[in-house]
Amino acid sequence: MVDLGLTSDQEQLVAAVRDFCQREFAPQIAANDRAGHHDPEIFAKLASLGLPGVCFPQRYGGYGLDYLSLGLVCEELEYVDTVYRTVLSVHVGLVGMGLYTWASEEQKQQWLVPMASGKKLACYGLTEPNAGSDVASM
């Protein structure tokens, strides 16, 4: 096993997310799965921990943590539910960090700030008419 040499902040982050997942997240996910129900409040609960902005710089309302920290958060979410791990990965990694890297300052203020707080949820289109789920053809 590789020793990642986690910082005390990263260890605290893992412990907080693990506790949240077991206490708040897992029971609700299990009940929703049995009922075939999606509860949009689950993302709001993730936002209450600041997870939607985990890697966003503090000036945009995020924690300003590194990608390893995002991976640690995602690993803890994955233990409970792959859907919300995917949602967070897309929100932060695919969309958010793309905006941070290439967007104008105006766009960052418009999108990253509300994304960091969880007021806006990022997504992307994987399936399009006449292209199916072939992203390369979109």
Regions found by a protein language model. Give the residues of each.
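Intrinsic disorder at enzyme termini
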Residues: M1-Q12
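Glycine-rich flavin
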Residues: E24-M138
